[in-house]
């Protein structure tokens, strides 16, 4: 007899089948379709039918009248892309938490307009030296698990040398046939395995996980928006200098006349404290005064600077060019004077431009900075974001010494990157700027925090106590005997602590384990959502009524069908085994004080009432033990709500009585014990752990019996 966790066991076969699930449908004939008398049954069997459709190499065939309800529960038409995933639903929900542990670019974009001040934490630090190409290469390897092909790397380095030496005019368009691209990561990471320069043209060959040949999109509005997007959400006092017109600031409802000073000679319609004048050196003391007052009031100031004089009319003459360079130089020194004058607790972002002629040296910085290329910047423009982090946002990548030569050299690298692999490079720059407000250190789950797959990494201590308030935690889910899992995704290996039903039974009241497929809020489902779960006290994400807001007891048939196939693979007939175990448990009642009578039609009377073993409890509990989560605490609450307000269910259709009584549910737990003991033998240690789960479920059922008399006397003969 195989052990529970043996390779090739029924349990492992069961879990493998979960990971192969696909939830597509087609309106074309030739798909997989069963016949049902009522539409409700088609919905109830939808997950099980999807499993069988997968096995047949087809997808479900639906009629137009059926597709809306299937799409509402997460199915998508075959060949279409996922518009919103369940993971995205969780990321969107993170805006409700003050502290977010482990960030992701799309999630940061979603919460960037939050009204409150966020605390963001992630251990990953974006490298930011004076060598943009090296920084990007390091990010590709460390964050994406991606290597830039050697042939492409050589060409990029060669072009950088040409630009620096003046052989190639920076104002030209490098390889103008390369398309401008702004797409998804998946689309921009299917690049050439090899690149050859032939007759002045880059010729790609083969495909690999790497950057595609592309130019970055140029968009001044988005450039300005992303420069500050990652910082506004972690600050609550703002001074904007030279930022007109700044239409993107209207997105932030937290920025008001009371906490935002807008300093620009051009009038705007912003409802801020507008100072309509040029910013001069003597105004630095005003900014120092404003920010000091804000700090004294416990606020977190952010100063954004985009000082730029108008270009001289004679710019195209030698005299005009020198005059412009001096103007740029003066602006840079004004910015540095302000940075040096401000308190170290003040965050500053200032646009910095190199002076290409010998007009002097920039003043020495007294605070550490990061010099960052800007996303969406014109490819031929040399401009940088000088990010001066407050003390909390420093991550060890800061520098003190920056020269014009450094900026010119950096601009050559950025120019080539944006013209050859600009699509992916621009995404990297966006992500880096979104992360500017993130504190790069490890923290623990706490009240008011969210940790979506960030604390589950095996390098962290496993969380076993979820005694928190207002929190959300996401992690992989597996069978009750497994505490960690290994997964491979996009070329990278992940090892994570996983959740299981043992974690769930130790949760305090009001805290629930919920599989991703069951969270409320829409979104399409994938197999990923059936092997991952959340633990939370956020009942807004949970549906306890088995409504059509989210998947629920459709999982019963999925577990049933997968079990049948897993047992068949071992030469066993699950249907016969299931029926035999249920009948045996019903018959066993006669020896413990009950009168059991079997009727001619096969129904069983217990003390004169028809009783069956609850298939819902059996499959929900067994599935959760084997690695397909439902949320046993969630299901127990669904049972209680049904007792309080008898109504409809997917299994029984419309009606008005309690689904099952105490005996029915209690026997189902015993049936689970029989299945495990007879066909999935556990080690002594694992069997002891399983006893904890089974005792918990039985105790909760007995509590319901002591609270509600109607739960003790359910007669399943009564028509629903």
Curated annotation (Swiss-Prot):
Top class in the EC scheme: transferase
Compartments (UniProt record): Virion
Catalytic activity, EC: 2.7.7.50, 2.1.1.56
Keyword DNA damage found: no
Molecular-function GO terms, alphabetical: ATP binding; GTP binding; mRNA 5'-cap (guanine-N7-)-methyltransferase activity; mRNA guanylyltransferase activity
Protein name: Viral guanylyltransferase VP3
Alphabetical UniProt keywords: ATP-binding, Capsid protein, GTP-binding, Methyltransferase, mRNA capping, mRNA processing, Multifunctional enzyme, Nucleotide-binding, S-adenosyl-L-methionine, Transferase, Virion
Catalyzed reactions per annotation: a 5'-end diphospho-ribonucleoside in mRNA + GTP + H(+) = a 5'-end (5'-triphosphoguanosine)-ribonucleoside in mRNA + diphosphate; a 5'-end (5'-triphosphoguanosine)-ribonucleoside in mRNA + S-adenosyl-L-methionine = a 5'-end (N(7)-methyl 5'-triphosphoguanosine)-ribonucleoside in mRNA + S-adenosyl-L-homocysteine
Role of this protein: Outer capsid protein involved in mRNA capping. Catalyzes the last 3 enzymatic activities for formation of the 5' cap structure on the viral plus-strand transcripts, namely the RNA guanylyltransferase, RNA-7N- and RNA-2'O-methyltransferase activities.
GO cellular component: viral capsid
InterPro entries per UniProt: Seadorna_VP3 (IPR026379)
């Amino acid at each position: 007899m195989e052990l529970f966790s043996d390779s090739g066991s029924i349990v492992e076969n069961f879990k493998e089948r979960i990971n192969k699930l696909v939830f597509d449908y087609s309106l074309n004939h030739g798909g997989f379709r069963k016949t049902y008398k009522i539409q409700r049954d088609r919905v109830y069997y939808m997950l099980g039918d999807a499993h069988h459709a997968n096995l047949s190499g087809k997808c479900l065939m639906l009629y137009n009248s059926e597709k809306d309800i299937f799409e509402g529960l997460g199915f998508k038409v075959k060949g279409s892309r996922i518009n919103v995933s369940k993971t995205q639903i969780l990321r969107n929900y993170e805006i409700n938490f003050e502290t977010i542990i482990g960030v992701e670019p799309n999630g940061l974009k979603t919460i960037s307009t939050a009204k409150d001040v966020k605390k963001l934490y992630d251990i990953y630090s974006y490298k930011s030296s004076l060598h943009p190409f090296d920084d990007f290469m390091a990010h590709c390897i460390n964050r994406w698990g991606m290597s830039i092909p050697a042939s492409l790397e050589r060409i990029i380095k060669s072009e950088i040398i040409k630009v620096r030496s003046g052989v190639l005019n920076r104002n030209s368009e490098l390889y103008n046939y390369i398309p401008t691209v702004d797409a998804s990561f998946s689309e921009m990471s299917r690049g050439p395995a090899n690149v050859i320069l032939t007759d002045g043209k880059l010729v790609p060959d083969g495909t690999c996980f790497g950057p595609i040949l592309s130019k970055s999109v140029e968009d001044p509005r988005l450039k300005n928006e992303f420069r500050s997007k990652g910082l506004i959400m972690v600050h609550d006092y703002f001074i904007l200098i030279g930022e007109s017109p700044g239409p993107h600031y209207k997105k932030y409802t937290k920025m008001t006349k009371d906490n935002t000073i807008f300093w620009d000679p051009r009038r705007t319609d912003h409802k801020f404290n507008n100072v309509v004048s040029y910013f001069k050196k003597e105004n630095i003391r005003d900014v120092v005064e404003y920010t000091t007052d804000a700090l004294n009031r416990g606020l977190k100031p952010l100063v954004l600077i985009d000082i730029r004089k108008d270009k001289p009319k004679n710019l195209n003459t030698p005299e005009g060019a020198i005059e412009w360079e001096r103007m740029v130089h003066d602006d840079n020194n004004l910015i540095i004077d302000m940075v040096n004058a401000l308190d170290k607790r003040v965050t500053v972002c200032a646009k910095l431009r190199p002076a290409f002629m010998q007009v002097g040296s920039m003043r020495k910085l007294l605070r550490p900075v990061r010099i960052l290329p800007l996303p969406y910047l014109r490819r031929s423009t040399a401009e940088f974001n000088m990010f001066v982090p407050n003390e909390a946002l420093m991550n060890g990548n800061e520098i003190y010494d920056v020269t014009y030569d450094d900026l010119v050299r950096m601009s050559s690298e950025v120019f080539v990157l944006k013209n050859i692999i600009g699509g992916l490079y621009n995404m990297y720059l966006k992500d880096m700027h979104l992360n500017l407000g993130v504190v790069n250190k490890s923290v623990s789950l706490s009240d008011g925090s969210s940790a979506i797959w960030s604390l589950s990494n095996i390098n962290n201590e496993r969380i076993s106590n979820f005694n928190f308030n207002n929190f959300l935690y996401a992690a992989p889910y597996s069978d009750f005997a497994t505490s960690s899992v290994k997964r491979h995704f996009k070329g990278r290996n992940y090892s994570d602590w996983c959740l299981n039903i043992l974690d769930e039974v130790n949760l305090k009241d009001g805290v629930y384990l919920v599989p991703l497929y069951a969270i409320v809020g829409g979104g399409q489902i994938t197999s990923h959502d059936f092997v991952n779960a959340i633990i939370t006290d956020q009942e807004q994400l949970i549906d306890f009524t088995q409504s059509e807001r989210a998947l629920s007891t459709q999982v019963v048939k999925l577990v049933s069908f997968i079990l049948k196939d897993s047992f068949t693979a071992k030469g066993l007939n699950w249907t016969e085994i299931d029926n035999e175990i249920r009948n045996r448990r019903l018959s066993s009642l006669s020896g413990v004080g009950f009168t059991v009578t079997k009727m001619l039609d096969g129904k069983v009377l217990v003390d004169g009432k028809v009783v069956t073993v609850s298939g819902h409890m059996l499959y929900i509990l067994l599935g959760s033990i084997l690695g397909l989560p439902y949320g046993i605490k969630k299901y127990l609450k669904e049972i209680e709500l049904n007792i309080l307000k008898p109504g409809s269910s997917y299994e029984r259709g419309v009606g008005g009585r309690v689904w099952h009584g105490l005996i029915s549910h209690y026997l189902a737990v015993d049936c689970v014990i029989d299945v495990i003991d007879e066909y999935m033998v556990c080690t002594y240690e694992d069997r002891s752990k399983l006893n904890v789960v089974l005792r918990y479920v039985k105790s909760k059922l007995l509590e319901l019996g002591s609270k509600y008399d109607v739960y003790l006397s359910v007669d399943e003969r009564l028509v629903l």
